[in-house]
């Protein structure tokens, strides 16, 4: 069953700063939120949406932390990591 998307959101100042610092563009953020590979609750009111991507022949997990207990949802932070086995459920 596909993970539920988030289509209405705002990017917090912190998330915008971290996206710029980490080289993650708005298009990447939108694609993860619109079609996440996985979605988990971190704590009540906060979810992490993530998807696997390949950038320059290297595989990453892009993780987006979102406060879902408000409307619109707030993107708290975004990062990418090569630690697929650590973060991806049922990693190969």
Say what each PLM segment does.
Residues 1-92:
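Ribonuclease/tRNase effector modules and their secretory precursors
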